[in-house]
Amino acid sequence: MIFEKVRDIIAEQLGIDPEEITMESSFIDDLGADSLDIVELIMALEEEFDIEIPDEDAEKIKTVGDVVEYLSNLE
C-alpha cells in the first residue's frame, strides 16, 4: 500500500518513529520538518516511485495524506 511505503520513507528521512505518522500529519507542524527536509523528502519520493514531482505540485504537499493522494492519482 502506498501509505506504508510513504510512511517508511518519511520516518527514515526525518528520523522519527513510523507509528507517529498518520495521513493527517503535517510535515512542518506535526513532524517537525523544515523546508530542507521537505525538499529531501520530495527527492526521496521521486527516487522511490521513479517519478518527477514538479515544484508547483511539491509546494501543495503539506501533509502525509497529500503525498498519498498525489501518488495515487499518478497510477
Curated annotation (Swiss-Prot):
Residues 1-75 form the Carrier domain. Pathway: Lipid metabolism; fatty acid biosynthesis. GO terms for molecular function: acyl binding; acyl carrier activity; phosphopantetheine binding. It comes from the Bacteria. This is Acyl carrier protein. Keywords: Cytoplasm, Fatty acid biosynthesis, Fatty acid metabolism, Lipid biosynthesis, Lipid metabolism, Phosphopantetheine, Phosphoprotein. GO terms for cellular component: cytosol; membrane. The lineage of its organism: Bacteria, Bacillati, Bacillota, Clostridia, Thermoanaerobacterales. It is found in: Cytoplasm. Belongs to the acyl carrier protein (ACP) family. The modification O-(pantetheine 4'-phosphoryl)serine is found at residue 35. One of its GO terms (biological process) is lipid A biosynthetic process. 4'-phosphopantetheine is transferred from CoA to a specific serine of apo-ACP by AcpS. This modification is essential for activity because fatty acids are bound in thioester linkage to the sulfhydryl of the prosthetic group. Pfam families: PP-binding (PF00550). PANTHER family: ACYL CARRIER PROTEIN, CARRIER DOMAIN-CONTAINING PROTEIN. InterPro entries: ACP, ACP-like_sf, PKS_PP-bd, PP-bd_ACP, Ppantetheine_attach_site. Carrier of the growing fatty acid chain in fatty acid biosynthesis.
